[in-house]
Amino acid sequence: MDRNIFQNVGILYRSYLNYANSFLKDLGLSFSESVVISNIGASEGITQEGIASLLCIDKAAIARNVKLLETGGLIEIKKNADDKRLKKLYLTQEGWEKYKAITAANTDRLADLYKGLTPSEISTLETVLNKLADKV
C-alpha cells in the first residue's frame, strides 16, 4: 500500500520521538527541552522569539522550556546591550555537553535512516523537505 507524504512524515516523526525519548531520558531532558538546546547550540545568541518563529512553535511553550533550562543551569539569558527587551540565549558548559550528546545521537539516527540511499538521493530529500518547510 502506498502512503502519502503526511503518513510518511508521521511515521518518521513518531519513530524519531521514540528514539529521542530513549536517549533523552538518560540525559534528564524532555524532547521539547532538547529542541531548545539544539537551536541555541546551532545559533548562539538566538532569542526565544527567534526559536518560536523558526520552529512555528508557540512563544509561551518556548518560554516555559527556557525557564526550566535556565533553572537547571543549562542555559544563560543575557540582555542585549542595544535593546534591553531582547534576551539572548546561550548554553552553559553543561548545556554544551548536552548539546553534543543530542547532536551525536541525531547524527547516528540519520546515518541509520540514510543507509541504502545515494548521496544524490539524500541531497534531493533534504532540498525538497527544506522547500516544503519554507512554505509553512
Question: Which stretches of residues belong to each language-model region?
Answer:
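Short alpha-helical "packing" element that flanks the helix-turn-helix/winged-helix DNA-binding module
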Residues: V36-I37
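N-terminal leader segment of winged-helix/HTH proteins
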Residues: M1-L27
